[in-house]
């Protein structure tokens, strides 16, 4: 089954014509098909009769209960205030096209579906027809039952708490329609803090694909709550670090308290976490160097940019008046290289237009979160920038600038870019855009080319931490860039971006707490560029469920079958768990349910999850043998009848996980 990673698939669909979208969706897996609205209008939903029949299976249990999110109340006024945070983002959320799609071309006789088999087309068409007839539940129904835990209504605060436990925020632009509808519902209904199924479906239908991904734990960090607890522990450990000195060469930097300390995380799927002083604005300073280099390469290409600047670490202080053997700055991360890169951006226009252009670019990278400007810092930098003026004149004498460049004007622009303000939260989204191949994770917009991202990360890895770059690459092994304001922009490629900020600096000019945090992070998690992902078992890998989790999943599955907890089994199936997992005696959940005589569990496993009714344990006993041995004749009869209908599924090239998702979700739907 295709995995919906981020919003790439939706972006692709939205760029196509209606006919193209229809053809694509009909060839896709049922998960995507069910997100479409019927051609006759309305939305896919189970009819009342079907809902009544399905309620014993779908109605109980659901998403695990979580404590209320920080600062979240169940009162209507405070929930409205919480939901109101999403209204500041002008970017609309990514959602499936609402217009009816035109019929696409028919599949040829030799075509296969998204699962690599020719039966997928019939499954999709059959599922689509049944949904139109109200015989099967929609994804919105499944999501409702997942969260409701057997209740007829969902408290709004419970939905928001469950949403936050996945790492998504109510302010996420991709959830704008959902949050707007929730806000409207709270204002217009008498029972504003409770959502029945119809109201819930109305609220989530525009963003159902993203929400389904979130609640099925299909984001890059599946267990985000556990991961953030580790981040908080590392934060507290680094907070104890003393020493270092706040930069004081200009008064605007010296005014910051040495006790300020914040860490923000944003994954490539838009999962967010912040701890500490993450909303305090500070200047990017040298952290802007990789960003403006990325802009230059994105606009002009690698070959043109590197006519003027090299790619090698200099081995010297970042502000030395020194060029390489070709009379070019060594790299874009030293002051000389950054000044030259600044001269390449939007040549031929005045500084005001250049500055607006870069600000708009950085706003896109930050997903329209806070990006500001400190005029006081700019004025102070210009007044105390004698060394940078000396570097500028040296570069001019060596003809390092493009022809016709106004060197003094370029230095003004350079000081302006150093004075751009961010918060830890907005800068973490910028870092996540670099981690995500140039796509902003919270808007889905492509901001940078893959070439620009690759080159930027390479230079951050080798030259980003001043004179500490070699040691940082050795010990931490991740692309990063530090600044004199105390920030460290850290990128874990294909996983997440982070901003660590604490003003006290070590003798190399890097944040003391930030360096300590980065070391601890890589000691705990296998994020180092050269950690062996397959054999390095001593480190935590937040990107996948570990061995302990797999053991727990078998225990939880068999225990739910033993106790007859259909609600838990439904939740496991929705999370794409393998419902045919075996214990050390090769016994499955169906063995246990048959031995205990749980009719509803047996029906659920057979009819909804489509498990194999013939599995044999270590003693060659099948579930039918278990039912007969313990005298559960009703279960024996069900198994006997189902064996006639069962068709074994062969192996496919898509892997066991895709088969599991196909069986579970397609069976559930």
Curated annotation (Swiss-Prot):
It catalyses: L-glutamine + H2O = L-glutamate + NH4(+). PROSITE patterns: ANK_REP_REGION, ANK_REPEAT. Residues 68-118, 647-669 are annotated as: Disordered. Residues 315-322 are annotated as: Highly mobile activation loop. Changing residue 321 to A: Decreased enzyme activity. SMART domains: ANK. It is an enzyme of class 3 (hydrolase). ANK repeats lie at residues 585-614, 619-648. Isoform 1 and isoform 3 are detected in brain cortex. Isoform 3 is highly expressed in astrocytoma, ganglioglioma and ependymoma. Isoform 1 is highly expressed in brain and kidney, but not detected in liver. Isoform 3 is highly expressed in heart and pancreas, detected at lower levels in placenta, lung, pancreas and kidney, but is not detected in liver. Isoform 2 is expressed in cardiac and skeletal muscle. Residues 653-669 have a biased composition (Basic and acidic residues). Isoform 1 and isoform 3 are activated by phosphate. Inhibited by BPTES. BPTES binds between subunits and favors dissociation of the tetramer into dimers. Inhibited by 6-diazo-5-oxo-L-norleucine (DON). Enzyme activity is stimulated by phosphorylation. Keywords: Acetylation, ANK repeat, Cataract, Cytoplasm, Disease variant, Epilepsy, Hydrolase, Mitochondrion, Phosphoprotein, Repeat, Transit peptide. The modification N6-succinyllysine is found at residues 130, 164. The modification Phosphoserine is found at residue 652. Homotetramer, dimer of dimers. The tetramers can assemble into rod-like oligomers (in vitro), but the physiological significance of this is not clear. Interacts with RAF1 and MAP2K2. Interacts with ATCAY; the interaction is direct and may control GLS localization, negatively regulating its activity. This is Glutaminase kidney isoform, mitochondrial. The gene is GLS.
């Amino acid at each position: 089954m295709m995995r919906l990673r981020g919003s790439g698939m939706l972006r692709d669909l939205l760029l196509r014509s209606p006919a193209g979208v229809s053809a694509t969706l009909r060839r896709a897996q049922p998960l995507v098909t069910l997100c479409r609205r019927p051609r006759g209008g309305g939305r896919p939903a189970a009819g009342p009769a079907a809902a009544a029949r399905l309620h014993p299976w779908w109605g109980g249990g659901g998403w695990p209960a979580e404590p209320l999110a920080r600062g979240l109340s169940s009162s209507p006024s405070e929930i409205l205030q919480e939901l109101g945070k999403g209204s500041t983002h002008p970017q609309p959320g990514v959602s499936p096209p609402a217009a009816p799609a035109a019929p696409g071309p028919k599949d040829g006789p030799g075509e296969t579906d998204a699962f690599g088999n020719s039966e997928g087309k019939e499954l999709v068409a059959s599922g689509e027809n049944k949904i139109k007839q109200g015989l099967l539940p929609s994804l919105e129904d499944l999501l409702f039952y997942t969260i409701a835990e057997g209740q007829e209504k969902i408290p709004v605060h419970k939905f928001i708490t469950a949403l936050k436990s996945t790492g998504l925020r109510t302010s996420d632009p991709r959830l704008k329609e959902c949050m707007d509808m929730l806000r409207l519902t709270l204002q217009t209904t008498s029972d504003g803090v409770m959502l029945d199924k119809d109201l819930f479906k109305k609220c989530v239908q525009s963003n159902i694909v993203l929400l389904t991904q979130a609640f099925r734990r299909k984001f890059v960090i599946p267990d985000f709550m556990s991961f953030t607890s580790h981040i908080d522990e590392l934060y507290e450990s680094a907070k104890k670090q003393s020493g270092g000195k706040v930069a004081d060469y200009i008064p605007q930097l010296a005014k910051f308290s040495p006790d300020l300390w914040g860490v923000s995380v944003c994954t490539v799927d838009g999962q967010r976490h912040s701890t500490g002083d993450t909303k305090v604005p500070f200047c990017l300073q040298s952290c802007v160097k990789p960003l403006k280099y990325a802009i230059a390469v994105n606009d002009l290409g690698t070959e043109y940019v590197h006519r003027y600047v090299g790619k090698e670490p200099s081995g010297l202080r970042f502000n030395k008046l020194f060029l390489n053997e070709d009379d070019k700055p060594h790299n874009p991360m030293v002051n000389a290289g950054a000044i030259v890169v600044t001269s390449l951006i939007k040549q031929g226009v005045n500084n005001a237009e250049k500055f607006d252009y870069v600000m708009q670019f950085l706003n896109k990278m930050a997903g329209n979160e806070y990006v500001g400007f400190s005029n006081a810092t700019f004025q102070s930098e210009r007044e105390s920038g004698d060394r940078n003026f000396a570097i500028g004149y040296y570069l001019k004498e060596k003809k390092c600038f493009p022809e016709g460049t106004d060197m003094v004007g370029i230095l003004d622009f350079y000081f302006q870019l150093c004075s751009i303000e961010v918060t830890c939260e907005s800068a973490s989204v910028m870092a996540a855009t670099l981690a995500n191949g140039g796509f902003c994770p919270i808007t889905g917009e492509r901001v940078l080319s893959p070439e620009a991202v690759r080159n930027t990360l390479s230079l951050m890895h080798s030259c980003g931490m001043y004179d500490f770059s070699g040691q940082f690459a050795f010990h931490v092994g991740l692309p990063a860039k530090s600044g004199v304001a105390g920030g460290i922009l850290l990128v874990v490629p294909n996983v997440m971006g982070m901003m660590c900020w604490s003003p006290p600096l070590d003798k190399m000019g890097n944040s003391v707490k930030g360096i300590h945090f980065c070391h601890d992070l890589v000691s705990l998690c296998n994020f180092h560029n050269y950690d062996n992902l397959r054999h390095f078992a001593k480190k935590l890998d937040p990107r996948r469920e570990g061995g302990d989790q797999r053991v727990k999943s078998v225990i939880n599955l068999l225990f739910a079958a033993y106790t007859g907890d259909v609600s838990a089994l439904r939740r496991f199936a929705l999370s794409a768990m393998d419902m045919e997992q075996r214990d050390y005696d090769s016994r499955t959940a169906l063995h246990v349910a048959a031995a205990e005589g749980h009719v509803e569990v047996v029906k659920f496993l057979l009819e909804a999850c489509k498990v194999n009714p013939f599995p044999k344990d270590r003693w060659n006993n099948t579930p039918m043998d278990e039912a007969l041995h313990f005298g559960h004749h009703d279960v024996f009869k069900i198994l006997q009848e189902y064996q006639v209908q069962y068709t074994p599924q062969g192996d496919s090239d898509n892997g066991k996980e895709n088969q599991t998702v196909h069986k579970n979700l397609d069976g559930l739907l």
